[in-house]
C-alpha cells in the first residue's frame, strides 16, 4: 500500500528530468541569478588575468624556448646534412677516380705483362727454332754421312755380289776395274 500511495503522490507532482519538483522550488541556479552577475564577472576577470599571467610568464616562454631550440636544432641538422652530402659527393668522386686509375693501371700492367710474355715466348721460340735448325743440319749431315757410308758399303757389296755372279756363270773371277766401271755406269 505504501508503494501505491507513493506512486499516486508522484503522479500528482510534476518532476523535471533532474528529479527536482517544480513546485516549491528553491533559489535559482547561481550562475543564472542576476544578483550574482557582478561577482561572477569579477571572478571571471581575476581568473582570466591569473591564467593570462601564468601563461605569459611561465608556459609561453617555455614553449617559445622549445620552439626556438627546435628550430636551431633543425637548422644545425640541415647544415650538417648539407655538409655531409657534399663530403659524400666528394668521396664518391674520389672513389670513382681511384677506380678509374686502378683500372687504367691494371690495363697497362696487363698489356705490359702480355708484351713481356710475348717477347719471352718469341725469344724461346727463336731459340727452339735455332736449336731445331742446328739439330736438323746435324741430322742431315749424319744422314749424308750414313748414306755415303751405306752407299760405299752397297758399292762394295754390289761388287762382291756381281763378282760372285760373274764367277758363277763364267767360272773365272772378273777384272775388278772393269766391274767397278760397269757398276758406276749403271748407278
UniProtKB/Swiss-Prot annotation:
Keyword Transmembrane helix (UniProt): yes
Q: Which superkingdom does the taxonomy of this entry point to?
A: Bacteria
Q: Where is this region: Disordered?
A: 1-31
Molecular function as annotated in GO: proton-transporting ATP synthase activity, rotational mechanism; proton-transporting ATPase activity, rotational mechanism
Keywords assigned by UniProt, alphabetized: ATP synthesis, Cell inner membrane, Cell membrane, CF(0), Hydrogen ion transport, Ion transport, Membrane, Transmembrane, Transmembrane helix, Transport
Topology relative to the lipid bilayer, per the entry, is: Single-pass membrane protein
Q: Any stretches that span the bilayer, and where are they?
A: 40-60
Tell me which InterPro entries the record gives. ATP_synth_b/b'su_bac/chlpt, ATP_synthase_B_chain
| Assembly | F-type ATPases have 2 components, F(1) - the catalytic core - and F(0) - the membrane proton channel. F(1) has five subunits: alpha(3), beta(3), gamma(1), delta(1), epsilon(1). F(0) has three main subunits: a(1), b(2) and c(10-14). The alpha and beta chains form an alternating ring which encloses part of the gamma chain. F(1) is attached to F(0) by a central stalk formed by the gamma and epsilon chains, while a peripheral stalk is formed by the delta and b chains.
Give the family per the record. Answer: Belongs to the ATPase B chain family.
Q: What does this protein do?
A: F(1)F(0) ATP synthase produces ATP from ADP in the presence of a proton or sodium gradient. F-type ATPases consist of two structural domains, F(1) containing the extramembraneous catalytic core and F(0) containing the membrane proton channel, linked together by a central stalk and a peripheral stalk. During catalysis, ATP synthesis in the catalytic domain of F(1) is coupled via a rotary mechanism of the central stalk subunits to proton translocation.
Name this polypeptide is given: ATP synthase subunit b 2
| Species this protein is from | Beijerinckia indica subsp. indica (strain ATCC 9039 / DSM 1715 / NCIMB 8712)
Q: Which gene encodes it?
A: atpF2
Amino acid at each position: 500500500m505504501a508503494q501505491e500511495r507513493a506512486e499516486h503522490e508522484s503522479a500528482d507532482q510534476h518532476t523535471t528530468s533532474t528529479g527536482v519538483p517544480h513546485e516549491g522550488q528553491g533559489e535559482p541556479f547561481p550562475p543564472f541569478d542576476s544578483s550574482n552577475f557582478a561577482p561572477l564577472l569579477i571572478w571571471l576577470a581575476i581568473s582570466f588575468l591569473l591564467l593570462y599571467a601564468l601563461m605569459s610568464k611561465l608556459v609561453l616562454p617555455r614553449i617559445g624556448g622549445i620552439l626556438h631550440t627546435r628550430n636551431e636544432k633543425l637548422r644545425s641538422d640541415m647544415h650538417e646534412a648539407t655538409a655531409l652530402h657534399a663530403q659524400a659527393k666528394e668521396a664518391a668522386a674520389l672513389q670513382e677516380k681511384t677506380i678509374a686509375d686502378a683500372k687504367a693501371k691494371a690495363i697497362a700492367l696487363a698489356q705490359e705483362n702480355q708484351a713481356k710474355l710475348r717477347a719471352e715466348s718469341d725469344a724461346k721460340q727463336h731459340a727452339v727454332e735455332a736449336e731445331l735448325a742446328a739439330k736438323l743440319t746435324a741430322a742431315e749431315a749424319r744422314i749424308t754421312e750414313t748414306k755415303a757410308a751405306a752407299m760405299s758399303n752397297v758399292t762394295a757389296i754390289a761388287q762382291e755380289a756381281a763378282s760372285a755372279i760373274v764367277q758363277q756363270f763364267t767360272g773365272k773371277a772378273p777384272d775388278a776395274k772393269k766391274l767397278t766401271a760397269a757398276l758406276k755406269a749403271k748407278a
